[in-house]
Amino acid sequence: MKKLILSLLCSIALNVQAQERIILLNEGNWQSDNGKISYFEDGKIVSNQWFRDANKRKLGDTPNDIIQINEDLIAITINWSNIIQFISPDGKRVAETEDVPNNRKLATDGRYVYVSSYGHECGTINGYEMFTKGYVAKIDIHTFEVVATCEVGYEPEGIAYYKGHLFVANTGGYAFQEDHEYETTVSIIDAETMQLVRDVDTG
């Protein structure tokens, strides 16, 4: 049984038949298109360009987060390239979506992937939706399409799934250049309906 550990360093570790495998996401330099994935087995580095080796192409510009959805699928947000890349555990591309621009962090319930976004638009199965603030997109892992969205606060970052709800940290990170204040709220979303339950002010 594969086990997943997600660390603050945006790495995932899998224990498969006593072999430790670590996949480490490297953001690279902003606007330099040099993001990459490093791959380790049993504490030894196998490749510092794991995605490129497997797919003969670059990963993209400023990858931001990585999560294992199930035993067959891993998702990566690539912020400045405006791509969510889906790969298999051997590093090969499965699918990608460009429907969630300025994507940030990831959460999953094993059936869907939930992505926070600083953006103000999103491509969904029902057409394009526009937002005043940031939002969370719900992606079907079988079709890789956005099936629902929920507007939250400005510039949402961290997102977690727990017992049917999503908890989203709003930052207001663009307050220095846009006409709004910094945020101190956490938005709670019903993951099934993608309806906002309430905002909690953390002070």
Predicted regions span which residues?
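Predominantly soluble domains enriched in secretory-pathway, periplasmic, or organellar proteins
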Residues: 18-203
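Sec-dependent N-terminal signal peptides
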Residues: 4-13
